[in-house]
A protein has these predicted regions:
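A common structural microfeature
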Residues: 7-9, 56, 73
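Aromatic- and Gly/Pro-rich amphipathic surface segment
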Residues: 30-64
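Active-site region of glycoside hydrolase catalytic domains
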Residues: 1-43, 86-88, 96-357, 361-389
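Catalytic domains of carbohydrate-active enzymes, especially glycoside hydrolases
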Residues: 58-79, 293-299
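Generic alpha-helix structural propensity
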Residues: 54-61, 69, 78, 94-101, ...
Length: 392
């Protein structure tokens, strides 16, 4: 039986745009996702987050559900545009009031709030000035962070600055699948990336200056590989591909965030392709100097799956999965090994406390005649993955 240590923190995580709704209520400004989702052809069937899970009105019910599950932590993101509608210092008291209610009620329930300051929903007003291509956005983020830290001082001590820069940059500014829907070359994408790293460093300084008890975290996602066998050569091969940053697949790596923030240096040419290496070589010195301010106290890892790897005759190579392998409704492979090997490799390289900040699966959920969702697939998935997590 899988046994977890007493200090293991069981919790749940959400994102503002994905659950809150209340898109135009109580002074909230427009985010890039508000604009993107209302642009014809951008989302499936024109879906938007205008209502979403309606957590803006039903947050008390959400907390009751958390209590019923005996969870001790809740990671939620704050909608920047609910706090500052245009991303400046136009503070919205009704926005603060909403999060005050949420935080205070969580604390009363014995559930510790973990705040994510940015989960993809940039104020549209800042995007119109260049968004993450513009270094001023990093400074605006630091101002927003300072205000949040001061407002919640003494109540919130667990902070994550960013969630998944890989999705923010690659899917928002590279492929255009996510807001703001741009398709920039690698150089333009990397400019966004370095500005997000810079923003984290400035924000970390604000959080620590406001309250020495604050813990600063960063949530990363990226490629995880696991060895096709226990042979040392395969273990080394999987490690190598986990941290590699080739030009054609550089963003979805933990390396691109965690090397600069945890090690104080960008990944070198031994890991990076030539185009990426050239971008790294052009990072302004003041951003490199700021990296020492941004070392996290904790890491959030979003891990859903992994890829099997072995040492081939010409170096590390991917192994084809067997026919009929299990997958989710989104066609993501079900790979419990990801929660075993992923945290191992990350811990070896960075040596910081870790949270599995996201994990789960998509299902084709059905409500049966008894009014319930008999969640067999999800129960099976979580059982498999928790065993892998317990082994770590």
């Amino acid at each position: 039986m899988a046994v977890f240590p007493k200090e293991f923190v069981w919790g749940a995580a959400t994102a503002a745009y994905q659950i809150e709704g209340g898109a135009v209520e109580d002074g909230k400004g427009r985010s890039i996702w508000d604009v993107f989702s209302h642009t014809p052809g951008r989302t499936y069937r024109g879906e938007t987050g205008d209502t979403a899970c309606d957590s803006y009105h039903r947050w008390r019910e959400d907390i009751e559900l958390l209590k019923s599950m005996h969870l001790k932590a809740y990671r939620f993101s704050v909608a920047w545009t609910r706090i500052a509608p245009t991303g400046g210092t136009d503070w919205n008291e009704k926005g603060f009031a909403y999060y005050d209610g949420l935080v205070n009620t969580l604390l009363e329930a014995g559930i510790e709030p973990y705040i994510t300051l940015y989960h993809w929903d940039l104020p549209q007003a800042l995007e119109e000035k260049g968004g993450w291509q513009n270094e001023d956005t990093a400074r605006a983020f630091a101002v927003y962070t300072a205000k949040m830290a001061e407002h919640f001082k003494g109540r919130v001590h667990q902070w994550f600055t960013f969630n998944e820069p890989a999705c923010i940059v690659k899917m928002g500014y590279g492929t255009g699948e996510h807001a703001p829907g741009l398709k920039l070359p690698l150089e333009g994408q990397f400019t966004c990336w370095q500005n997000i790293i810079y923003a984290h460093c400035l924000a970390a300084q604000e959080l620590r200056h406001t309250d020495a008890e604050n813990r600063v975290g960063f949530v990363s996602t990226g490629r995880i590989c696991y060895p096709a066998s226990e042979a040392k050569a395969d273990v080394d091969a999987a490690r190598a591909l986990t941290f590699a940053c080739p030009d054609e697949d550089w963003a979805f790596t933990h390396t691109m965030s965690l090397d600069p923030l945890c090690l104080g240096r960008w990944p070198g040419p031994d890991l990076c392709g030539p185009q990426l290496s050239a971008c790294i070589g052009a990072v302004p010195q003041y951003i490199n100097d700021a990296l020492s301010l941004g070392r996290p106290d904790m890491l959030g890892l979003n891990i859903y799956n992994a890829a099997p790897v072995q040492m081939g005759t010409n170096g590390p190579c991917y192994v084809e999965r067997p026919a009929g392998y299990a997958h989710t409704a989104m066609n993501w492979p079900v790979e419990p090994e990801s929660l075993n090997w992923g945290p191992r490799y990350i811990q070896e390289r960075y040596g910081l406390p870790m949270f599995i900040a996201e994990n789960g699966l998509s299902c084709t959920d059905k409500i049966y005649r008894d009014g319930k969702v008999h969640d067999v697939e999800r129960i099976d998935f979580l059982a498999r993955y928790q065993i892998g997590r317990a082994h770590v």
